[in-house]
Amino acid sequence: MDKNTILEFCFFGDRYQLMALKNPNKLVKNKQVKAAFNVFMKHRTTLSATNYMAQIVENFEQFLEYIHDKLQPGKLLALLFKNKQFLGWFCVGQWGNMPVLSFWIDPSQQQSGVALETISFFLKYYQRTLQPRELVWSFYESNQRSRHLANKLGFPSLFYFKKAEPNAPKVYFGTKDFKGESVIETKPYLGWGSGWKVNQMLKPTKNLTVNLINIGFDAYADSQKALLAWFKTHKLTKGQVEVFFNYELCCLCISYNHKQSWVVYSFQQLLAKR
């Protein structure tokens, strides 16, 4: 796409518009994009995940530059509208070798089912079209809503992904078995906020060899305590804990190998080992 593209799709008879922006950093003067960003900034104090971006992004131009700088060629910023009302935004692109899909839904729209329907649509769409070997999912959501939506979609707020072999399914979600392979068991209430039970998060199984686990993290003190307790339980060193807290997106990447040992990498270290 060389210019903005308006796509239309339906959920249960309701018609939505998707504005796909090929070059978001060049659209500072676009009124709809500016309105979308205003909504983003308006709700930033109520969303723990969004707060982090708001600290980096102080104005609209910086927001677009932030998105543009992080996504390599082939990037796409999509803004979702219904009846000219902004509902949320999506980004798809790559960080290093990793395909990345991120989204944010306006909290005022979540009770209407729009968020659930939209997430379902994009999940199926990008699985079908991108077919990434691994997918890192950044979940820009609020505490209870993120868990509720994730549960309704059939997987917990803790997203994890199995490195696919040739001709194997590209992405694994939830706690379902697939062709006899058990995935990691997780608790359905895990997600953003202070309700984490991090020491109960991960139960490795024998059949998995490599897993990349992307855990959203916010700055609540009790979440930090729970995370530290989890690290202690798994006998990880203080240096490895620091890697987690220094991780650029406030996320944790863990590599789990066949020897059942846990190794924590920074994002850059993880890419280097690939």
Curated annotation (Swiss-Prot):
Q: Domain N-acetyltransferase: where?
A: 39-179
What InterPro entries does this protein map onto? Acyl_CoA_acyltransferase (IPR016181), GNAT_dom (IPR000182)
One MF term in GO for this entry?
A: acyltransferase activity, transferring groups other than amino-acyl groups
Q: Name one Pfam family in it.
A: Acetyltransf_3
Q: What is this protein called?
A: Uncharacterized protein MPN_027
Q: Which organism is it from?
A: Mycoplasma pneumoniae (strain ATCC 29342 / M129 / Subtype 1) (Mycoplasmoides pneumoniae)
